[in-house]
């Protein structure tokens, strides 16, 4: 099915989803999607419905609500045109980029205001319109990606494309201020030394005055070793959840739901859904090949670490020097999904559990 054949109901729902989550904020929207995905996967695992209406899987209005092979509520809502990250989260992030260029969203926020994605943005028509427009854009990008057969996660690819698109649309640098850096783009030590642009008394300015030279995505979690070890732990745990439930998406849903703690101000809680998803897929895709089972968990830990390190590399190159939120976990999932698709094509992984187009 090509993008031009998308049911009008799905397109309208995409606009509504983007508007809704521009009002609530991008990160609250993603945590809500995680809650819905978790509930949907539990229903699937325990024998709940795996159909929506008269359609099989996630097909609604003659179109797959989720390009991923998710079922029931997970696919139709959690990955669909209302709460799917490519719609809701991306719409909320774009709305923050729009509003953050014009005014202060949060006087206590240390970075550029356009990176403030945890706060509700209200109900002003222009803000909702931006969210709705990028929600629609996310539906179209994900659908085109799935139809063309790109061997990556179409939902997260749409999140990444949307992030670059809102930077272009609202006049932000595409990758940030990387030419004037005294050190490598990967170097976060200027943050540790509290180095700033301009005068130090304008931390919430929409310009550069007073801002950190580099702005780590998660100030409590950017050390390579710490991030990698965390990825191993999350990967093993997610692999175990996948093995005992048979669900590719349950661990992803749980870890995405945990973003609610960040929304509530517990900023030391790590972001881990980009570690959980590749680990879960790898665990299920290795089942026919690996014995004993503990080796599967080891492999899941490796994929969790890869997801973690890819996310850290993404934040250092595409977030820390920029003015808006371009989601490091989404970039990570795009990269790890491509790796998984390649390994499936080479016969290293069983392509059956892999929820992406085959190479």
List each language-model region with its residue ranges.
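Alpha-helical multipass membrane-protein architecture
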Residues: 2-359
């Amino acid at each position: 099915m090509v993008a031009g054949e998308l049911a009008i109901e799905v397109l309208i729902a995409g606009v509504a989803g983007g508007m809704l989550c521009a009002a609530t904020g991008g990160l609250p929207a993603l945590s809500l999607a995680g809650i819905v995905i978790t509930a949907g996967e539990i229903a699937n695992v325990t024998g709940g419905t795996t159909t929506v209406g008269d359609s099989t899987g996630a097909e609604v209005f003659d179109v797959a609500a989720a390009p991923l092979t998710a079922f029931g509520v997970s696919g139709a809502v959690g990955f669909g045109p209302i709460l799917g990250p490519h719609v809701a989260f991306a719409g909320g992030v774009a709305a923050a980029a729009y509003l953050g260029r014009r005014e202060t969203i949060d006087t206590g926020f240390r970075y550029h205001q356009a990176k403030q994605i945890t706060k509700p943005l209200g109900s002003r028509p222009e803000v909702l319109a931006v969210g709705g427009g990028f929600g629609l854009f996310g539906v179209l990008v994900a659908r085109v990606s799935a139809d063309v057969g790109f061997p990556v996660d179409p939902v997260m690819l749409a999140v990444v494309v949307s992030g670059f698109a809102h930077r272009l649309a609202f006049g932000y640098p595409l990758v940030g201020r990387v030419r004037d850096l005294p050190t490598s783009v990967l170097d976060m030590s200027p943050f540790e030394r509290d180095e700033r642009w301009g005068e130090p008394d304008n931390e919430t300015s929409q310009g550069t005055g007073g801002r950190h030279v580099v702005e780590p995505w998660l100030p409590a979690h950017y050390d390579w070793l710490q991030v990698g070890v965390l990825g191993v732990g999350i990967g093993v745990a997610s692999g175990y959840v996948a093995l005992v439930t048979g669900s590719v998406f349950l661990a992803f849903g749980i870890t995405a739901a945990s973003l609610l703690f960040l929304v509530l101000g517990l900023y030391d809680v790590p972001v881990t859904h980009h570690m959980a998803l590749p680990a879960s897929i790898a665990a299920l895709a290795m089942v026919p090949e690996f014995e004993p089972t503990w080796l599967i968990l080891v492999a899941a830990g490796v994929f969790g670490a890869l997801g973690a390190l890819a996310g850290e590399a993404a934040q250092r190159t595409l977030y820390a020097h920029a003015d808006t939120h371009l989601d490091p976990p989404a970039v990570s999932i795009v990269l790890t999904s491509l790796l998984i698709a390649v390994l499936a094509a080479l016969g290293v992984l069983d392509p059956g559990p892999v929820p992406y187009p085959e190479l």
